[in-house]
Amino acid sequence: GLLNGKPLKKMINELTETMEVGESAARRLVRTEAAYYTNMAAVEGYKECGIEKYRYYAKLDLKVSNICRELDGKIFPINEAQTGINLPPMHPWCRSSIGPVIDGGVAQRIGVRTRDVVTGESHVIKGDITYKEWYDRFVVDKYGEDKAKELEKKAKTYKKKKTNKKDN
């Protein structure tokens, strides 16, 4: 479906009907596979351009997995890229991505859109920020450590509920 430009929603609906699975299971599979092909295409494109390294970018929110937090900002040789090891997706629903490292430096992303963890207000911040820098600056510094821990717990509870949701 991706190669034909088919919308994700259409692929999800077709998979739900064809395989007789719940919509949540179909959505998880389609989104995870889309992430796989997107990142593999990026790796191949980087290789064709002579780019030898890439940087791992975790999604900047409290729902990001521990493994993606740990990998965020790390730089890997392009010829060692392995899905599930150092290349997203690392797990189902993975929202992490990669970016090229050019001439020994990280290619600057112009900016990355993120949401305030309390208000949900959307804003753009510098593109080369790591997860830890984002967390310290936009969660802990802004709301305090106690509130940060409370927000983390809430995000994990939400994530667990979403993961355990039964398909109809």
Model-derived features: where do they sit?
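Structured, charged N-terminal subsegments at the starts of enzyme catalytic cores
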Residues: 1-14
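Activation/maturation switch segments at domain boundaries
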Residues: 17-18, 24, 28-168
